[in-house]
Amino acid sequence: MGPLMVLFCLLFLYPGLADSAPSCPQNVNISGGTFTLSHGWAPGSLLTYSCPQGLYPSPASRLCKSSGQWQTPGATRSLSKAVCKPVRCPAPVSFENGIYTPRLGSYPVGGNVSFECEDGFILRGSPVRHCCPNGMWDGETAVCDNGAGHCPNPGISLGAVRTGFRFGHGDKVRYRCSSNLVLTGSSERECQGNGVWSGTEPICRQPYSYDFPEDVAPALGTSFSHMLGATNPTQKTKESLGRKIQIQRSGHLNLYLLLDCSQSVSENDFLIFKESASLMVDRIFSFEINVSVAIITFASEPRVLMSVLNDNSRDMTEVISSLENANYKDHENGTGTNTYAALNSVYLMMNNQMRLLGMETMAWQEIRHAIILLTDGKSNMGGSPKTAVDHIREILNINQKRNDYLDIYAIGVGKLDVDWRELNELGSKKDGERHAFILQDTKALHQVFEHMLDVSKLTDTICGVGNMSANASDQERTPWHVTIKPKSQETCRGALISDQWVLTAAHCFRDGNDHSLWRVNVGDPKSRWGKEFLIEKAVISPGFDVFAKKNQGILEFYGDDIALLKLAQKVKMSTHARPICLPCTMEANLALRRPQGSTCRDHENELLNKQSVPAHFVALNGSKLNINLKMGVEWTSCAEVVSQEKTMFPNLTDVREVVTDQFLCSGTQEDESPCKGESGGAVFLERRFRFFQVGLVSWGLYNPCLGSADKNSRKRAPRSKVPPPRDFHINLFRMQPWLRQHLGDVLNFLPL
């Protein structure tokens, strides 16, 4: 038999060698929906179903196998017919110290659930929540709290079960979701010494749910703005150096962009991945920070297109060029999704840089790292990606003190075989932030990256940043603090709230309206960073009149004790001069990492949410001193002491004639009391490494500096003193109409 006859017989016995590879059946329509194919009807093609808003596909996708049959990822049995099912939002499993209505097993799109608290408890969060078409509730978790714990009541998200009901320092709470729901966020949280719960608020969600771009963009932007604020925001670059910036002690950011290029990603989707990453690079280089960018694409194996060890990683043009040259076909021989290998490439890059710089050097230890993973599927080869994350955390020595040195953002794209549990496991867990998301498609991803870092907004909103390192000066710790002087005598203090406005007390100016000889000293007066400014305009509250109630036997009254000073020049921002955050503004909202749509009341509930709130003011010598603001019933007992002051208020019958609800109260035996000359200074809190002014020093019953010429000498009042020390501070939450009237063009105020 000749060679041609042998070949003919082989083709007859194995007809598959002569025909093209089998294709999958085309009877895959979905009732009420549509579908797309990544590679036609050929083996390896991913079929993705879509449904109208408010419905979700079941199954979400199918894969064409080499046998010519469709397989549903994760399914244990074949589904004969794909259908669109109605989206439902999870129901509350329990709600403490209150009631909710209506009580349903789950809620339809458009449905509402309302919450009310029992007597003695205050509602935090949203009183009414709305079920959205993506299967998520709008608003925030409703909590009925009495402020009794060291940490506020962490609440129970809808669909979750919590164990642990003690909220003292070191206490832990644990969460799990009811059946068929997926937990994102932290399954365990601990009450920390600063009164804040560790980790991220847990959310129970349907497996088919996804995030809207308008929710993801501000969440990512808020987290990034916090990170950027800690990464050398004042370092300037020179174009002549081609943006080539050396690693410095003042801080450096390594940004790692990981782009999925596996079989389930279409060429068009990969293009949008690249465009989104380019947007991020463009935004990040718009900030005056030291940054290096790594680019890694991956399928079955990773390809490092740009390493942070390459000098070009610090050049925006070179990084974007590397992205543009990324080729979809480079991975066509590897069809799997090896997320472990991609993250391990980051680990190896870090390890090489650590060896180059030295593990114990500040140059290595001061680098902050951010990883953004863009994927449309579940890791299906190479081992657990969590193992690589554990190695990364270990090499960076990530612990409670160094938690801010690593951020991992895990972003799933498309309603495919995206695994919520895996994304949540990879994403960082930080208080008030989210790091794991699923978006409906790559167009939504592009929209997120367009809006998450709007430089025009963020450069004016980095407020409340103080340097808390051990070697920082007092002024660097509180860079908003200013001194107000008539001629040469120091009289009052104030707080920088923008680059040209100072907030202070009205009684500093009660002796006349001519302020031409007054000066405001901004920055450290003992160094080259200090500078004196003339006052262009003083705005005194018209309601302030210290003698307004003299006829009632009240010799001095400090209601409306608030003033604004507009400086003749703008202040150049530096580590010694930077505004503090004012609550009820968009700037403070970003710093608090709160969602869009937050209100002034939300800020008050978050900042003044306990019976005794730790706070601070700045002393004459520039040091930061501690007080406790009394709220609720403790405010009443704090203020009642005024009735014992017979010199200033000899005929007082009602304490509230002197201490109105405009005032915050402090001054117990454990507290410091402000001295004369410290009036007008900020009363401020620390939250999430940022500082927020909630009041300003107004008046008190005791002057600890009386009779002393030494700024560092303060005398505590004897325990037998009558009346005991009490101090009163203008509550900025009660002065909102006046602040909005005069600062509406300066700050971006939230709804009341």
UniProtKB/Swiss-Prot annotation:
GO molecular function terms listed in the Swiss-Prot or TrEMBL record: metal ion binding; serine-type endopeptidase activity
Sushi domain: residues covered: 22-86, 87-146, 149-206
UniProt-listed CDD domains: CCP, Tryp_SPc, vWA_complement_factors
Top-level lineage group: Eukaryota
Segments carrying motif MIDAS-like motif: 260-264
Peptidase S1 domain sequence ranges: 464-744
One GO-annotated biological process of the protein: innate immune response
Residues of the active site: H507 (charge relay system), D561 (charge relay system), S679 (charge relay system)
Residues listed as glycosylation sites in the UniProt record: N29, N112, N290, N333, N467, N471, N621, N651
Enzyme Commission number: 3.4.21.43
Annotated signal peptide: 1-20
PTM description: Cleaved and activated by different proteases depending on the complement pathway to generate complement C2a and serine protease complement C2b chains. Cleaved and activated by C1S following activation by the classical complement system. Cleaved and activated by MASP2 following activation by the lectin complement system. Cleaved and activated by GZMK following activation by the GZMK complement system.
Domain VWFA: 254-452
Family the UniProt entry places it in: Belongs to the peptidase S1 family.
Record's protein name: Complement C2
Species, as recorded: Pan troglodytes (Chimpanzee)
Species classification: Eukaryota, Metazoa, Chordata, Craniata, Vertebrata
Gene field: C2
